Amino acid sequence: MGIQLLPLHRMEERHIGLTQAIADCFYEAACVCLDRHHAPPQEFDLHGDSFKQKTLVEWKSTDDRSKKAWANKDDATRDGAYAFALAATELCLGLCAVSRAETLTGADYYIGLRDKSTDDLENCFRLEVSGTDLDTYEVNRRLRGKVKQALKGKSNLPAIAAVVGFRVKLITMQKVYDES
């Protein structure tokens, strides 16, 4: 089997926790982040607790208007990382966005199985996300920080931390376990 495509396009059709406007916004931010360092398409490494694989990332190069709209690098990186992390959890774990998480939960999104009822978050995971344009060391440092943040969250749901390294073409994910 060939390299699987990272499912960044039309995410609202699979992630009920995203509207079309939000999915489009996250995708556009991701394109701006990718264009800082690369030309399409590119292969990214995807690392998780029990897997290491490559994924193909395809995107449309952004124009000057999009780059100016996303001139705040922090906002673009955060929102682009949301797109990548949600697409990666879908591809590797079969989990999709169910809802945005509340403040202080130690997460950005709740993710769950696509074909399960989402009225109750009991069967969901929390997803804590970060993105960076720096090196692999920084990706790993941020992952450790996101794990700690998820552990401190005011929620008893299990969590997954994810960090996207746009420059180094790396997506890392780690399940978070409460050791108490």
Locations of regions flagged by a protein language model:
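A generic structural motif
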Residues: 112-114, 164
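Flexible, charged surface loops at secondary-structure boundaries
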Residues: 119-124, 152-156
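A short, highly charged nucleic-acid-interacting micro-segment common to nuclease
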Residues: 66-81
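A recognition module on extended beta-rich or small alphabeta surfaces enriched in W/G with H and D/E
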Residues: 2-12, 16, 20-24, 130-179
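Short beta-strand or tight-loop elements
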Residues: 105-107
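Conserved catalytic cores of phosphodiester-cleaving nucleases, focusing on short active-site segments
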Residues: 84-93, 109-111, 120-134
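Short beta-strand
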Residues: 98-103
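Nuclease-adjacent, charged terminal/linker segments that flank catalytic cores
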Residues: 1-60, 64-70, 174-180
